[in-house]
Amino acid sequence: MVIDSIFHQKVQPGKICLYLSKEEFPRERQDLPKRVLDYEKLGLNICFREYNLMPHNKYFYALQDFSDKCVITIDDDIYYRNDLINNLLELHRKYPHSICANKVCQVSFDEKKKFKPYSQWKALFYCNTPSLYNVALGYAGVLYPANIFYKKDVFYKKKIMELALKADDLWLKAHEILQNIEVVAGEYYC
């Protein structure tokens, strides 16, 4: 399980939170398998929230609940190497004002300076220069510095649901550009 891979990290996070929606789990803890509940004994915090913001759940609630802390997000369907957190923290030490990702893609433009389709953006595993053109790919692990989003429009639920319910990476990229927040990738996948 993904949760297991986080508990086996070389560097342990201060807190591990699993955000779930009451829409998906209306009976909350009663709807969860015992193997997930067993992780609470190791320190897992299971947090139920009203709205299911799909891929946005992984950052939306944590960045608000822990705005004064660095927050690392991961996906729920990948088993991570035991140095994921350490890699992101090392990258953060070098670039404390940038969002740090284990993998990024770069926004690409055509000859008329118009955006190319997302599918044509180049994926990068290593890009040690922070840039507004880098898009953090959430599935690979992302570290958000404390208080990174000073404009709170990024947390506007109604707009997320209307415009970008299944496009969390692009929603965040738009707000990073609006707030001049650069993204950098480390050597995790090299």
List where the protein language model places each region.
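Acidic donor-binding loop at a coil-to-helix junction in glycosyltransferase catalytic cores
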Residues: 164-171
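Conserved catalytic core of nucleotide-sugar-dependent glycosyltransferases
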Residues: 62-63, 79-158
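A short, glycine-/small-residue-rich helix N-cap motif at loop->alpha-helix starts
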Residues: 50-57, 166
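Short beta-strand-to-loop acidic/aromatic patch adjacent to the donor-nucleotide binding site
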Residues: 68-79
